[in-house]
């Protein structure tokens, strides 16, 4: 397999990648790679439209080994591309040579990176990959590394997703281990911003619990922000969708920043206490803002981080690590009104009660052993008072 990297030889870069994976594993961290198998770049080894790579790409020669990967209506300039972007020619996913290159060859793309230490793949635009392709890929991954993880980019409820006229079989045929939980993000945003009640959030969570296999439900990628969405800090207060030029220079006011930061505390608390695997987009813990791509991909603000916010996320991470009920427990909602949300997480004979006060008024709740809390105003023998926009966890 040809691996082209900018600095150093493929062997040197392979060793560097393996060292990265080994260092991550020593710290209990798994490493996923982003697999984009629905299209390539036009300026790539395989298509080579600009002639920047050695060898003959599909654009350069009809005898290219990659010619069968692409759909040409009139070679070389008329070809099928991803959503009409001519810089992203679409791939024939079930082309035998493409299948061998990506999946089945001894040193296929999948095999190569798993052998170097990769722990799985996030599959870009999974809706555009045929069921047969997904099944082959996941089976090959599990053959080489049984505990590796295959995550699909799906924006809707993946259990009943229809794409290109077909009902997808992501879970029925074990094509994916899990998906990116965008419905979760939408429900959290709508609740925190007061657009929906706690009932709408509950309905979203319980619909996924009912529709997804249990093991998928508990390892869903619960996200608040990604490279495909506005920064969560921005999304919590600013709906601006004007032209790119206006987005580039748009910044939150001091008041907006204060409101967004407080809302982020609550949103992240729910992210780490509801079922699923919380995913933190780099910089969200440092108070980064920004609208859509590319303004959500700015450099990390080294030396200008919000340390209190970072410590908040560290506390949430330790909380989830230490409480099996938050990782594996059942969920039952007991409060889901316009202002308040309450649910239990139960596992192994232990029950945690989770409270979230979205309102600007105090909320009295039953007393219990405090496991985690923010904005607790009163701690009495029989009750606790959550302050405005406060949240806490108690144990019976």
Name each model-derived stretch.
Residues 164-165, 221-252, 268-307:
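Aromatic/acidic polysaccharide-binding cleft in carbohydrate-active enzymes
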